[in-house]
Amino acid sequence: MVVFSKVTAAVFGLATIASAAPAPPTRKGFTVQQQARPAQKKQVNLPAMYAHALTKFGGSVPESVKVAASKGSAVTTPEAGDVEYLTPVNVGGTVMNLDFDTGSADLWVFSGELPASETSGHSVYKPGRTASKLPGGSWQISYGDGSSASGDVYKDTVVVGGVTAHGQAVEAAAQISSQFLQDKNNDGLLGLAFSSLNTVQPQPQTTFFDTVKSSLDRPLFAVTLKHNAPGSFDFGYIDHSKYTGEIAYTDVDNSQGFWSFTADGYSIGGGQSSGSSISGIADTGTTLLLLDDNVVSDFYQHVEGAQNSDEYGGYVFPCSAKVPSFTTIIGGYKAVTPGKLINYGPVTDGSSTCYGGIQSSGGVGQNIFGDIFLKSQFVVFDSEGPRLGFAAQA
C-alpha cells in the first residue's frame, strides 16, 4: 500500500527495522496455495476500485473518476460462477484468509478490537498467550477513495505453509471504514513489499518474508496467479514445472520500498515494439494494469468503439469488441497479456459496455503491473540483487 509515513529509528547512526525471528531449522522452501472462496452477490464500484489503485501509491484521482465513483455509475455484480482467491494464514492460533500483496509491507487483520457488528462473517484475531503488545506501536492507512484503517500492533506467532515466524508484527485493526467491510471473505492483508515500506510507528517492522527468508534455501518467492483458478506462492525455491522457456531477469529499484522495474518497451496485438521504456511496480494487490496516458491511448486506438468516459471514470468499449493482447518487453522476453484479461467486464449488470483492465496511471508517477498483467506470468521476486524474473506460465 502507499507509504503513509516512513519512520526511521537510528541505532549507532544506522537506520533499523525491528525484526522478528523465524523458527529453526532451515528448510528448502514451501508453497501456499490460494483457496477458492464462493463470491458473494456484492456490487463492485469500478471507478472506486480504480481510484483506490491510484491513491494506493500516492497518486491523484482525476475529477471524472471521483464523480463516477461517488455516483456509482459503474457498479456491477460478479457473476454467480465467479470466485475469490485468498490464502489461509495462521495468525496467533486463528486461521485467517488474507490477500498477499507485493505492493505493501504491512500484515494487518480484522481484530477483536473492532465492534462485533463490523466483524460478522470474518475470522477475527484475538491476541492470546503467544502475543505481546508492542509498546507505543500504532499503524494507520488511508486512501483517496475515503477508505481507512488503524489500530494497535502485537508481536505474535504467524504460520504460513508450515513455516513459523515468532514475534511477527501483527497490526490489529481497531478502526476500519465501510469500504473494507464489504468483502466478508477477506480477513486482512499480508504485505510482501520491502520492509522499509512498513507503516508501523514509531519503528517500522519486518514483513513475514523478511522474517523467514534466512530459513529458506533461497531468499525469494515466486508468484503464479491464475485467471478463474487458484494461484500459488512458492517461498524459497523455483518450481520449474510452473513456467515454460527461460526466466528473464531484470533489476529492481527498491529505493521506495516497492518491487519496481523497467521494461524495454511494449507492443499491441503482436505488432511492432514501441521501443519506449516503461517503469513500474509488480503489485499483486492491484487488480488493474495502470500505464502512462500515451500508452493507454495507443492501446485503445486498437479497440473499436473504445472511449475515455467521464460517466464511467475510465476507458470503456463495447463488450462485443475484439480486444488485442498487450505485450510488455523485458530484455529478450515478451510478456503477453491476453485481450480476454483486459476486458474486465460489464460496467453495470447486463450492460453491453465493458470496462477496460488497462487504465491510466494518472498522477501516480509510475506504472502499476497489477493482476491483469500478472495472471499470465510466472514471476520470481528475488531479494538478492534485488531482481524480478518473468516467464510464461506453463
Curated annotation (Swiss-Prot):
The active site is at D101, D283. Residues 85-391 form the Peptidase A1 domain. One of its GO terms (cellular component) is extracellular region. Residues 21-69 form a propeptide. GO terms for biological process: proteolysis. One of its GO terms (molecular function) is aspartic-type endopeptidase activity. PROSITE patterns: ASP_PROTEASE (PS00141), PEPTIDASE_A1 (PS51767). InterPro entries: Aspartic_peptidase_A1, Aspartic_peptidase_AS, Aspergillopepsin-like_cat_dom, PEPTIDASE_A1, Peptidase_aspartic_dom_sf. It catalyses: Hydrolysis of proteins with broad specificity. Generally favors hydrophobic residues in P1 and P1', but also accepts Lys in P1, which leads to activation of trypsinogen. Does not clot milk. It is found in: Secreted. Residues 1-20 form the signal peptide. It holds the Pfam family Asp. It is an enzyme of class 3 (hydrolase). Its EC number is 3.4.23.18. Keywords: Aspartyl protease, Disulfide bond, Hydrolase, Protease, Secreted, Signal, Zymogen. The keyword NAD does not apply. The keyword Secreted applies. Disulfide bonds join C319-C354. Secreted aspartic endopeptidase that allows assimilation of proteinaceous substrates. The scissile peptide bond is attacked by a nucleophilic water molecule activated by two aspartic residues in the active site. Shows a broad primary substrate specificity. Favors hydrophobic residues at the P1 and P1' positions, but also accepts a lysine residue in the P1 position, leading to the activation of trypsinogen and chymotrypsinogen A. Belongs to the peptidase A1 family. Monomer. This is Aspergillopepsin-1. It comes from Aspergillus clavatus (strain ATCC 1007 / CBS 513.65 / DSM 816 / NCTC 3887 / NRRL 1 / QM 1276 / 107).
